[in-house]
């Protein structure tokens, strides 16, 4: 009789283990995306979704190194906090002030980088209708991903970047930390739907 149960992946000591850490994590499409490419290229690997609360992030990163993970991606709300937990940070992550990828070095040290800026701006460049001269850009939020987007837009030559966050102090800190000179903050309460549509990119 045909096996009614799906065949499970058989893991071995050679299986490459990676994942994504977030809180919550149910929204992440990363496991499906990475799983697709692992399967397509017949890579002996597995990619987990890992639900980790902010107060357990340090333990989690130490744990993945001990368990033989190759590395992890980071999503909300860990990108900024993970900076202080990495042993090494590359220049891109330092400038953005957040990491979205942590790899485990052969010596067990944690190395942080950030690919959000590159991924975001490359997607815009692939849109034939987009140019940096279209007008002001509006960023909602001031977390790790917003930092990367702000840096990418500034480097691309966008004339003005307007950062809107529930707490204005955090938006101002983003500008100071990333040293972006063409960015301003606006109050969340002062922005209407019409305003956002007018500046949509």
Per-region residue spans from a language model:
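Phosphate/diphosphate ligand-binding glycine-rich loop within oxidoreductases
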Residues: 12-129
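Conserved S-adenosyl-L-methionine
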Residues: 155-160
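Conserved small/polar residues in nucleotide/adenosyl-binding loops
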Residues: 194-201
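NAD(P)-binding Rossmann-fold cofactor-contacting core
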Residues: 161-177
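Short amphipathic alpha-helix with an adjacent loop that forms part of the alpha/beta core around
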Residues: 189-193
């Amino acid at each position: 009789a045909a096996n009614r149960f799906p065949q499970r992946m058989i893991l071995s000591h050679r299986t490459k283990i990676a994942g994504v850490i977030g809180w919550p994590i149910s929204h992440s499409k990363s496991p499906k995306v990475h799983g697709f490419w692992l399967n397509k290229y017949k890579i002996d690997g597995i990619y987990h979704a890992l639900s980790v609360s902010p107060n357990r992030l340090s333990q989690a990163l130490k744990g993945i190194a001990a368990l033989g993970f190759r590395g992890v991606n980071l999503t909300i709300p860990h990108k900024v906090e993970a900076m202080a937990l990495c042993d090494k940070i590359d220049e891109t992550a330092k400038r953005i002030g957040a990491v979205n990828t942590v790899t485990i070095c052969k010596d067990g040290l944690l190395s942080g980088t950030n690919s959000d800026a590159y991924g975001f701006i490359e997607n815009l460049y692939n849109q034939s209708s987009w140019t940096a001269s279209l007008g002001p850009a509006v960023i909602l939020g001031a977390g790790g991903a917003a930092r990367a987007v702000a840096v990418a837009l500034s480097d691309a030559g966008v004339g003005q970047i307007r950062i809107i966050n529930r707490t204005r102090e955090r938006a101002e800190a983003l500008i100071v930390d990333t040293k972006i000179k063409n960015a301003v903050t606006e109050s969340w309460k002062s922005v209407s739907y019409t305003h956002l549509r007018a500046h949509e990119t």
